[in-house]
Each structure stands twice: as C-alpha cells, then as structure tokens.
C-alpha cells in the first residue's frame, strides 16, 4: 500500500488530499482561491502564484504532520482548465491567468481566420483560452508580457514546484488554443494567429509520466519516502472522468461550478457549425467532445447561502420531495453552447401579481431545476450531433450529491443516471487511479455500490421544462 499527496486546483477553491492506493482519502485541506481585478481591462482577473503556493504547501505540511506514520511515495495534481501560470527567466511563477479572466475579449477581432483556428484547436475563437489571455496581456500589460520565459497550466505548475521541471499535459495544452489536436503538438500557425512566441511553450508530457524526483527540500520537509516522485496529472475534467469509467460512445456529466457534458471519441470530431468543443483527452489519446451550460453549481451555492443558510442540504432535499407544483422558473446558467452565445439575462420568472403562496423553497427548487434543464438541453444536443446513444448517463462531481438533481436529470433524459463510488471527489479519485497505474499498484476503486437513478414519466420536472425554456428564451431573445 502506497500513499500519495494530491492537489486539486478548482476555480473556487483548492484541495490538498492525502490518500492511499486503495482509493481511501485519509485527510484533506481546502482553501478558498483569491483573485484580484486588473483595472486596465473591463473584465480581467488574476491571481498571485506565491499566495496559492503558500497555501498548498501549508496544506501538504499539515497533512503529513497529522499522519506522521505515513511516508508519501508520490505527488500529483489536477487543475481547472483554461488557467495558466507565467514564469520568469529565473523560473519563478509571477502571475496567474485564471479561467475567469476575460482580458482578451476586446481583442478577439484581431485573430485572423477563426475557421482555421477552430479546425486546428477544436475550439472557437473566444477569450476563454490561454492564447486570448496572452494576447490581452501583451496589448495592455507589456511590462508583464515581456517578463514571460515560460507558460504552464496550473496543474503542471505544481509539478514545477516539486521538481523544478516545467511541462504541460496535452489535456491542458489544448486549453491554450495553441495546440493542434490532430497533430498532438504545439501549432506554429496558431501561435502566429495570436502573436505568441512558441519559445514560451514548454515541452509536452503525458499524464502518468514521472516528471522527476521530488526536490530534496520538499521530500525532507514533508518526510516523504526517499524515492518520492511527482506524477503528471492534467485537466480536472478529464481526470475526474476517469472515476466514471467512461468509454468511447458514453456520455458523462461533471457537475460542479460548471457542468460539462462530454462524450469520448477515438477520432477528432469536427462540426462546421462550431457547436461543440473538441478537447484532447489525457495523453492526447482520443478526444473529448463537449457542450457546457456554463455556470450552474455556483448559482445554487450562492442562492442557498443567501436564502437558506440556516438549512442543511439534507433538509432542503426533504423539502424538495414534498413539492407537487412550481410557482416560478429560474434561469441562471450562462451559456447556450450550441448557439455559441452567452446568456446575459437571468433571474426568477413569476406570474404578476406575486402570489401569496410563493416561498423560499419555490425559489431554490427552481434554481436546481434550472441546472437539470440546462444540463439536459446540452445532453440532448450533444447526443443528436455525435449520434452517441448510450443507454445511461455517467455522472460525477459534487453537484450530484443532490438526489433531487439526479432524479430530475434521469427523468428529463429518459436515461438511467449512474454514479460510481467516490463520485463526490471524482478528481481526487481519478488522480489516485493515475498514480496507481504509474506505481504498479493494483487497480482498486472506492468501496461501495454504484448509485442508479431510474427515469420516471409525468413528473413535475416534465411540466417545468417547457415553461422554463419559454421564459429563458424570451428573456434572452433566443429563437
């Protein structure tokens, strides 16, 4: 039995976990990620790598000190997609460009031949990806841009901290929009389109590869095994999907801050209408075709904190079970993916005048139903476009801890929803599996039986969906 330290860098928070090769999570620390606004842009945010590094290493120290009997054999990490760290000539991380940074938005019309960009990268031209962030940085923060020696993703940045080597995994490289998904290498043509010097792009390294031995200063400080190594992880979505045991032809949903709906394909998928993103899978082996309703789980979390901070999640679930009608609809998801458009207008939609019977449960249930409807809409379009007709939906991520959400999605889709043991911490479980493969440990999975939600007919969510769709579309001018 071996033990591993795992770093899971999300959008809202970062988790550091101590786990063993059998899939048991011994202990965990969670930290809220801090961001700052850059006033040189209308919508730009950044983070300070030194702040994040201090918290991550503190978490590692606390875990190792709390379990002195354990000697860690390996470290690995997964990170949010579209999030990058800039390194200077001394190898110091000096600036972070997170996925929520939109500094490149006003410069996207400078990018030539967007059709070719989509064909090569699998993604339409948008401010979401690393290339656009670098373009925006060069335009208004040249003093920062000129400091760049190398760029890496936040997951491989952890590897740089622990080993001194800078690389990028293909699942993260494709999020830069500078990676050719078919050739599986950095693209000179994409670099020229965005004005990026290819010299700042690091070597590619596959998930599961040993990046190198852990530096002595960290091995000694954390009382690790003498032969402790860092194992390359990758993008958090692709890592989490390992936990679902997804195979080509399956469709899965990762329910978290956002809720990507994905299917795996052996060959690169091209849609001339650009209704999907095609991502590189781990190691560049195969492709992940994606639609995404945008922000979902974060909406529910915020409404709960504001309206129901005094209720537990379990109490809310019990209240949902009693509902037989709905008083309003909600629309807070942020993307109509298959139309390549953001949904800028949202809120609660209620009849006028306001009915006396409307209460807080009606509002928060509507937000949960909004998530289910938004995921279902993406699922249906992805299934039709790719012709992947799997009999079940595979699910993972903390959002699926809501029984009501799970049942709504099963009912709407008419397909069984399957959650395998450990789905709540899917990214950590995916990293454990990856480390086990590299270290030659038996392939074990978290204990327990899969949870299955069987679809039902003529449920409340079936009456809600057409009203939700009409209200959402009317508010946003969707045809």
Region spans (language model):
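N-terminal glycine/serine-rich phosphate-binding loop of ATP-dependent small-molecule kinases
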Residues: 1-96, 119, 146-147, 219-220, ...
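Structured loop/turn residues at beta-strand edges in well-structured enzyme cores
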Residues: 70, 199, 388
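Active-site core segments that coordinate phosphate-bearing ligands/cofactors
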Residues: 5-6, 111-124, 135-154, 159-165, ...
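Gly-rich Lys/Arg/Thr-decorated short loops/hinges at beta-loop-alpha junctions or inter-strand turns
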Residues: 34-43, 116-117, 167-174, 197-198, ...
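Short glycine-enriched loops at secondary-structure junctions
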Residues: 22-24, 31, 80-81, 100-103, ...
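Short beta-strand-loop/turn "lid" adjacent to the catalytic site in phosphate-handling enzymes
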Residues: 64-99, 124-128, 155, 159-180, ...
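Short acidic-aromatic active-site loops that bind/stabilize oxyanions
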Residues: 42-53, 123, 127, 204-208, ...
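Short, acidic/turn-prone active-site loops that include or flank metal/cofactor-
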Residues: 30-31, 36, 98-105, 173, ...
